[in-house]
């Protein structure tokens, strides 16, 4: 009985370690996604600014 209990604890420990690795992997992916999103937002902002400048120039020309 005691051996089964110890085996169960060891198995749970292994599973918890695997879960921790999965969580760490998810955190790393989240950081990468956040960086990509920031980059995309900056790029979108640039395009919007460029469009605004272009529209203003077109209005001046007309």
Swiss-Prot record:
Residues 1-32 form a coiled coil. Keywords: Coiled coil. This is SPbeta prophage-derived uncharacterized protein YonU. The gene is yonU.
